[in-house]
């Protein structure tokens, strides 16, 4: 089991920050769909996160996605990202 010393949360709606996070070498990068994203930007954030997981080199960083709460009306859409092959897991 690998030790995880750093966990970097990044708003999923900000491509520039996602790109930067991919290059920093954190043990885990958590792409946030919950508090870090305005309600009006949730759909765009899902698209950016999917693009980032497909196109960016995160090196050895584990990739996680923090999904919205079950009662938010957003979680079902968020969970579609769970099947992405470059995603390690979800943060509930």
Language model regions located:
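Expand to "…catalyze enediolate/carbanion chemistry for C-C bond making/breaking, isomerization
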Residues: 1-92
């Amino acid at each position: 089991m690998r030790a995880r010393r750093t966990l970097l949360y990044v708003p999923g709606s900000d491509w520039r920050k996602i790109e930067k996070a991919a290059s920093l070498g954190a043990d885990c990068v958590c792409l946030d769909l919950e508090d870090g994203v305005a309600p009006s930007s949730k759909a765009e954030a899902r698209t950016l996160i999917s693009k980032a997981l497909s196109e960016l080199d995160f090196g050895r960083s584990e990739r996680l996605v923090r999904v919205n709460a079950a009662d938010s009306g957003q979680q079902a859409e968020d969970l579609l990202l769970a099947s992405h092959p470059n995603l390690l897991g979800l943060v509930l």
